[in-house]
């Protein structure tokens, strides 16, 4: 989950870019310049910071790839995909705000997640402890293309990828692996993470029946539990996959007049809200009054 350092820095510069001014007549030339400076600075600082904080004490090696596609029942891959998607959506909005053309905003902004996360893979590739993951690179690209393709086709994100977390029952069995506090656990405890695909069926299929409000989405989730190790888990030996059906709120469809509040809500829009949920796992159906 080291790539999340990039996400936090990107969120930081996005907040600065979008909330710093509220010009009636925006200076797009200045906005473009400021955006590129902030983004370049965030990228450089993250690389230096990661190298000092994470890689410094490990041996270097020649660049190499690894195959970790069986680890954590692919939960880490869903993490890469969802993060790349969300950073791409923020990138599109930020480049639009800065005055770039529609196609430039979609392609350059949409690829921001892949660009930032791929830098981590390069550092991994030169580390003897890890290695560049082809699965991670593919997941990064798919997340970006999911954001880009929707923006090109619909000019909005009708189908959203989201994230939710609640500490798993086994998170305290190995605090070095799963984290010592709630922030660390939210990044490292794959057993407590759930990744969601959220959509409004009427909106996607253009039925215009008005049976459901535009802000109410159906949410289809994927998670896994009882994974005690990061060593290429085999689904036949350890861990159980979980599938969920729930509801969600599309914050983009809420009628919020306050621009500051709207921007802040959009910045945390990747979080799936607690809702009644049906879970299928171990061959059984379970109902949760509220699942997060």
What label would you give each PLM region?
Residues 165-169, 222-228, 251-253:
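Transmembrane beta-strands of outer-membrane beta-barrel pores
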Residues 80-87, 124-151, 243-244:
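Alpha-helical transmembrane segments that form the membrane-embedded catalytic/substrate-binding core
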Residues 42-43, 105-125, 141-144:
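Small-polar-interrupted transmembrane alpha-helices in polytopic inner-membrane proteins
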Residues 134-192:
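Glycine- and acidic-residue-rich phosphate-binding/metal-coordinating active-site segment common to enzymes
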Residues 145-146, 195-201, 245-251, 287-289:
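Residues on the lipid-exposed face of transmembrane beta-strands in outer-membrane beta-barrel proteins
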């Amino acid at each position: 989950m080291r790539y999340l350092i990039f996400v936090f820095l990107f969120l930081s510069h996005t907040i600065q870019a979008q909330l710093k001014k509220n010009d009636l007549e925006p200076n797009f030339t200045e906005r473009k310049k400021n955006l590129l400076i902030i983004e370049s600075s965030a990228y450089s600082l993250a690389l230096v910071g990661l190298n000092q904080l994470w890689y410094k004490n490990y041996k270097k090696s020649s660049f190499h790839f690894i195959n970790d596609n069986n680890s954590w029942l692919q939960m880490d891959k869903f993490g890469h995909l969802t993060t790349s998607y969300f950073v791409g959506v923020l990138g599109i909005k930020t480049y639009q705000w800065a005055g770039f053309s529609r196609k430039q905003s979609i392609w350059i902004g949409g690829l921001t997640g892949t660009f930032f996360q791929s830098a981590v893979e390069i550092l991994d590739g030169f580390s003897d402890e890890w290695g560049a993951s082809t699965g991670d690179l593919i997941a990064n690209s798919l997340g970006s293309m999911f954001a880009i393709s929707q923006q090109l086709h619909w000019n909005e994100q009708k189908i959203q990828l989201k994230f939710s977390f609640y500490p798993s029952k086994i998170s305290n069995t190995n605090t070095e692996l799963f984290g010592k506090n709630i922030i660390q656990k939210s990044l490292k405890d794959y057993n407590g993470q759930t990744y969601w695909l959220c959509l409004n069926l009427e909106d996607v299929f253009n039925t215009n029946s008005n049976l459901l409000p535009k802000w109410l989405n159906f949410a289809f989730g994927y998670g896994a539990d009882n994974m005690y190790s990061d060593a290429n888990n085999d689904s036949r030996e350890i861990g159980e996959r979980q599938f969920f059906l729930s509801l969600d709120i599309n914050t983009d469809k809420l009628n919020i007049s306050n621009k500051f509040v709207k921007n802040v809500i959009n910045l945390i829009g990747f979080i799936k809200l607690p809702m009644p949920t049906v879970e299928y796992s171990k061959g059984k159906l379970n109902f949760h009054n509220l699942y997060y």
